[in-house]
UniProtKB/Swiss-Prot annotation:
Catalytic activity: D-ribulose 5-phosphate = (2S)-2-hydroxy-3-oxobutyl phosphate + formate + H(+)
Role of this protein: Catalyzes the conversion of D-ribulose 5-phosphate to formate and 3,4-dihydroxy-2-butanone 4-phosphate.
Organism this protein belongs to: Shewanella sediminis (strain HAW-EB3)
Chain positions recorded as D-ribulose 5-phosphate binding sites: 37-38, 42, 150-154, 174
Name the record gives this protein: 3,4-dihydroxy-2-butanone 4-phosphate synthase
Amino acid sequence: MNQSLLSPFGTAIERVETALISLKQGRGVLVVDDEDRENEGDLIYSAETLTNEQMALLIREGSGIVCLCLPDERVKHLALPPMVENNSSQYGTAFTVSIEAKEGVTTGVSAADRVTTIKTAIADDAQPDDLARPGHVYPLRAQPGGVMTRRGHTEGTIDLMILAGLKPAGVLCEITNPDGTMARLAEIISFGAKHDLPVLTIEDIVEYRKSLMAEAS
């Protein structure tokens, strides 16, 4: 079903290439996971190029839970422990404690404040003491190996940033419909057309990475 609805946007490889161009240009992408998994679409931006306007769109059109995807080594560097010791969530989503920048924010809730927190966390010279805990940004720890290890939006986000030549850090939020229900692929495609955002799937990223590995072998 996913692939048939997405076929007008090209092959899996072409959809990833289009997404990488969008990210390199500082724009966002929409990533849908498998229909037999969460079957949800996330709006994703590079943390490196994220703007206040983009954050406002995430908050306005999404679930409100704005997450910062980080690789394992960055999570360890920032000394961010897991949100819970025993993760019993259905898909093992690796939330850490939530964070807030210690400087440059007010309540931490506004779009500008959340962007400040994200930029603080991904700064080259970032230190654990730069961040207060808890806060209004929710870091997610990506599994090493990306989508080849776990087919989640967290890993897909990090893979896309690396493939685009950007810092391995991305911001995501699930897209919801006006009535509060989760947007599925058909609604995600309509949302993408409205906001000029390319749409791709986690499976597309898997296929793209497999093609790169095949070329290298």
